[in-house]
């Protein structure tokens, strides 16, 4: 997927010609704990955040390798393996959203390959997934999971990506 201008992004998100509304102003910090080749650029991450967030946010996105991903998952979730994405929310009630999204680059790349998806689409899905967690979405129960998946599909569609679950509708 090519990088789009702000106007193209707004048009893709259904915002062009719409009644002006206050848009989220995400402050996105990017940390690369692994080589950058093949990873999303800051401009892409900012665009995804702009479309996914409903309010102002301060988000750090960190790309890590398998060892760091495994250590974080073990420390914070008690699971001794590298997972694709971890989200850490720091927001207090009534304050701007704040949090970290950690993506384990080799796990995301492997999953994309195994699922026959473009790597960029899988990164976009997992960043949106993390941004939804920062906004209070969860997938612990069936109803919550359905609500979160619907939001992911809607946002990714606005960004020009297909259904990450491979289902139509």
Language model: regions and residue ranges:
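An acidic/histidine-cluster motif and surrounding catalytic segment
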Residues: 1-124, 134-169
């Amino acid at each position: 997927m090519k990088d789009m201008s702000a106007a193209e992004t707004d048009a893709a998100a259904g915002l062009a010609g719409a009644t002006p509304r206050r848009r989220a102003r995400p402050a996105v910090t990017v940390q690369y704990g692994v080589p950058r080749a093949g990873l999303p650029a800051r401009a892409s991450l900012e665009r995804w955040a702009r479309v996914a967030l409903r309010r102002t946010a301060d988000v750090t996105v960190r790309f890590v390798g398998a060892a760091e991903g495994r250590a974080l998952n073990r420390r914070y979730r008690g699971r001794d393996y590298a997972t694709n994405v971890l989200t850490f929310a720091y927001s207090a009630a009534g304050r701007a959203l704040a949090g970290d999204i950690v993506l384990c680059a080799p796990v995301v790349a492997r999953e994309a390959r195994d699922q026959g998806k473009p790597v960029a689409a899988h990164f976009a899905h997992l960043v949106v997934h993390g941004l939804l967690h920062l906004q209070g979405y969860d997938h612990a129960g069936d109803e919550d999971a359905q609500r979160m998946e619907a939001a992911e599909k809607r946002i990714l569609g606005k960004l020009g990506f297909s259904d990450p679950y491979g289902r139509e509708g």
